[in-house]
Amino acid sequence: MFFRRHRIATALVLILILSLTYLLGWSNIFTAKSVSYSGAPTKSSQLAVKKLADISIGERLARIENRKVSTRIKTLPWIKSVDISRNWINGKVSVSVEARIPIATFNGQLMDAEGKRFELPGGYTEKLPSVFARDTKSGLAAIELFMNLPTEFSTRTSAFTANSPENIFFNIKEGKRTLLVIWGNGKDTAFKIKVYKALLALPENSKIKKIDLTDPRSPIVK
């Protein structure tokens, strides 16, 4: 009697497993009824995510592998993270991405605070500082300098160039003039700005085109 009950219980469990497998993998009950996308900053970037996600209405939810879909989407350089969820009750699949936020253009490409360089489909409309550098470390140093400058100063700057983190220079508008400022490294920013303003206030410097603040205690004007 015991063995008979055991066989019946085993058979019922097997039937249950097979039924669930069928329902999840082949039945039309648990299928994707809608797919939503969020987080992509432009229409073109959303289309790129949608193409790589490759999720179709009517597709079995059990066959939508979150890890594989996320891996495909993460091949887009501008993607920072991906989150995918499946609602087994209403059949909704949600694909949410977090885009990298650019803080500057680096050698013609967008770059975020982690130093990741990328291009965004559809472009980026907000104005960003333009940085040219030999390597990422130097580029990040130039960007950090820009971000530490007072707004009334930074809004007049352009074309940041960094040969190294210790050798940063840029252009700045002063009325109708454009001056080349050799800044050096990102240290002593407040003091360098004070020296810069003091130099411009001198009548004999009314026609200078270049200021070297590498050593703010011994500035050079030309």
Spans of model-derived segments:
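Charged, solvent-exposed interaction patches on well-folded alpha/beta domains
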Residues: 1-36, 43-60, 67-71, 75, ...
